[in-house]
Swiss-Prot record:
Chief localisation class: cytoplasm
Annotated residues for binding of (6S)-5-formyl-5,6,7,8-tetrahydrofolate: R20, E77, K117, K435
Species whose genome carries this gene: Bartonella bacilliformis (strain ATCC 35685 / KC583 / Herrer 020/F12,63)
Cofactor field: K(+)
GO CC aspect terms: cytoplasm
Keywords for the protein's UniProt record, in alphabetical order: Cytoplasm, GTP-binding, Hydrolase, Magnesium, Metal-binding, Nucleotide-binding, Potassium, tRNA processing
Its biological purpose: Exhibits a very high intrinsic GTPase hydrolysis rate. Involved in the addition of a carboxymethylaminomethyl (cmnm) group at the wobble position (U34) of certain tRNAs, forming tRNA-cmnm(5)s(2)U34.
Keyword Acetylation in record: no
Lineage: Bacteria, Pseudomonadati, Pseudomonadota, Alphaproteobacteria, Hyphomicrobiales
Name this protein carries in UniProt: tRNA modification GTPase MnmE
Length: 435
């Protein structure tokens, strides 16, 4: 197997650059460049000297002997000065060692999986942790990376294996009084409870999609109600055209925010009105589709001239808010939330209300739930097989046990315990090179 290396510390230049090396030639590489093999897992400071005798850098080196390393192989980290020329020269030197090459994306993590240091759920959690932009996404990633999900899935898989063992015992020793008909009550009761637990877990995961994808807030209203001014103030910069001419917003504009540690996608849409313009009507149709997909719809009224608007039926929560508070002198009681997007009057309160809505949406999400669609898909497959085993009472007992085996295999594919070779390239290609 090749020895692989890569920069693990991010973009250059930087104060420090960490070069990770893993594979069978690590000991030889460290001895050659450092002039010694440092004590395992201790920082060693010294000059790094190339094989031609030239000075590379004054650096810190750490040696991690197998199997007590991230990959399970011999590993080393070289902490260099983070200049591009320094790092490139060092990488060139590493490439001169026979069987030593630059790592592919996610190859360190893939080797850790192969060596049994992590499972697929933990690998996906690591990838999500690296990509996390918000506190909620970080918490979601940690749940997978720290092994809690793996423990749960293996616990459920053990329940399935126990049920199959009891069924096999009934099939093989049906003449024994203490075995006969045992599975007809206890096993199926346990399997129904397991199916219920899986369904609840799946529902938690689908609700928790907002932690990864973000809460979708759609702003709608008639033309010139101030929707574009709202999106500009939320963005903190002009992203939408603001004029007195109606119909200037034709397509949906997106602004990504972080509120209360949650990702929030806010969309400005075309003003709702009757129009003969095909382009404008297309924008209105797009706006209606976004309303259907929204978590929160904010219907904006011009407080000086409120107008009726017809929205498509949606499961989203709908707020009617009043804009242009700074120039409204009439009755204001109809709007629980009112502000001026133009000068910011009361706008902080509006923003806080959106944040409260977002936090409320995740308040009922449990502590452990599937983090990826792949996991949810396999959990649903497991439920389908368990339910078939429970409900198909007309089948031979051995066939019902086969459904439980398929359910067990589905859970095993989540963690990578069985038959996942075709998934490895997809999962580990999502990592950065140094991971």
């Amino acid at each position: 197997m090749d020895t692989i290396f890569a920069v693990s510390s991010g973009l250059l230049p930087s104060g420090v650059a960490v070069i990770r090396v893993s594979g069978p030639r690590v000991v030889d590489i460290v001895k050659t460049l450092c002039g010694c093999l440092p004590k395992a897992r201790f920082m060693h400071h010294g000059d790094l000297i190339a094989r031609d005798g030239s000075f590379l850098d004054s650096a810190l080196t750490v040696f991690f002997p197998r199997p007590h390393s991230f990959t399970g192989e011999d590993c080393a980290e070289f902490h260099l000065h983070g200049g591009k020329a320094v790092v490139n020269r060092f990488l060139d030197e590493l490439s001169t060692f026979t069987g030593c090459r630059l790592a592919e994306a996610g190859e360190f993590s893939r080797r850790a999986f192969i060596e049994g240091k992590i499972d697929l759920v933990q690998a996906e959690g690591l990838a999500d942790l690296i990509e996390a932009e918000t506190e909620s996404q970080r918490r979601l990633a940690v749940m997978g990376a720290n092994g809690h999900l793996t423990e749960l899935y293996r616990h459920w898989r053990n329940k399935l294996m126990t049920a199959r063992a009891l069924i096999e015992a009934e099939l093989d020793f049906s003449d024994e009084a203490d075995v006969s008909n045992f599975s007809s009550d206890k096993v199926w009761q346990n399997m129904q409870e397991l199916s219920d637990s899986l369904c609840e877990h799946i529902a938690e995961g689908e609700r928790a999609n907002i932690l990864r994808d973000g809460i979708k807030v759609v702003i709608v209203g008639v033309p010139n109600s101030g929707k574009s001014s709202i999106i500009n103030r939320l963005a903190g910069r002009p992203v939408a055209i603001v004029t007195e001419e109606e119909g200037t917003t034709r397509d949906a504009l997106e602004v990504r925010l972080i509120l209360g540690g949650l990702p929030v996608l806010v969309m400005d849409t075309a003003g709702f009105r009757e129009t003969e313009s095909k382009i404008e009507q297309l924008g209105i149709d797009i706006a209606k589709q976004h309303v259907l997909d929204a978590d929160l719809v904010i219907l904006v009224d011009d407080m000086k001239n409120p107008q009726k608007i017809s929205l498509p039926n949606t499961s989203a929560e709908i707020w009617r808010v009043g804009n242009k508070l700074d120039i409204c002198e009439g009755d204001k009681t109809r709007w629980p939330i009112q502000f001026s997007a133009l000068n910011g009057l009361n706008f902080d309160y509006f923003l806080k209300e959106i944040e409260s809505f977002c936090l409320h949406r995740i308040a009922e999400i449990g502590n452990i739930f599937p983090a990826r669609k792949r996991q949810i898909q396999l959990l649903k497959e497991a439920v389908k097989e368990i339910d078939s085993s429970i409900n198909y009472t007309f089948l031979d007992l051995s066939l019902r046990a086969e459904h439980l085996r398929r359910a067990s295999d589905a859970l095993g594919r989540i963690t990578g315990d069985i038959d996942v070779e075709d998934l490895l390239d997809i999962i580990f290609s999502q990592f950065c090179i140094g991971k």
